[in-house]
Amino acid sequence: MITSTILVLLIPFVCTSLGAACVLFMKNELSVKTTKMLSGFAAGVMIAASVWSLLIPALEQSQSLGKMQFVPAVTGFMLGMFFLLILDTITPHMHLDNSVEGPKSNFSRQTMMVLAVTLHNIPEGMAVGVLYASWISGTTTITRAAALSLAIGIAIQNFPEGAIVSMPLHSTGSSKLRAFVYGVLSGIVEPIAGILTILAIGIIEPVMPYLLSFAAGAMIYVVIEELVPEMSEGGHSNRATIAFMVGFCLMMTLDVMLG
């Protein structure tokens, strides 16, 4: 069980690495339209995962509270948002539009871009870890298939995310190999966050609904803070909106079919 769980936790990281490898084979950087579509797709997957795989199970696990079953979901959701907000505030990082956030530092542009993506990958790793911890505990209705569907959904959106990281790094002066390595490193935090969450199962089991919604709040914060501005940058485009819908439907389908 442990080996198979670790392997599943590595799937999103592997897909991030494969996406980052695009910089080794593609001659031209991603166009603005392509980047917007990929951001829209990733946003759709993350919103659907937050709702279907995290918030709904959090509400279901709180049914014993009756009409107050929303309390764990709302509390965890807001805590997840504040968690990412604090990380965004204390960590120097740079978004793809070259806007800098956080305290002043001597970090290079490349390092700050990687830090931005790394920060936003933490809730994705936590989300997969929380679902697997919930399944391993055996005290909830969450199945192994449900946890696997989330891991697959995150992995699918990680492929374009890896390319979105490595390609701009190369265009700003990094060598292809260096850009690839940075892209890979941006995703390594996901399996680490997932494994740490599972290892803490004895502590987190009593507060599982809070943690499920915590991961959802953190992921939706990433969507609003990072992906929505990227998919909306420049002129209006229906392509990014369509890509969002496709990503949402794909993740919803995975959750229903496998969960």
For every predicted segment, state its role.
Residues 1-259:
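Intrinsically disordered, metal-sensing/regulatory segments
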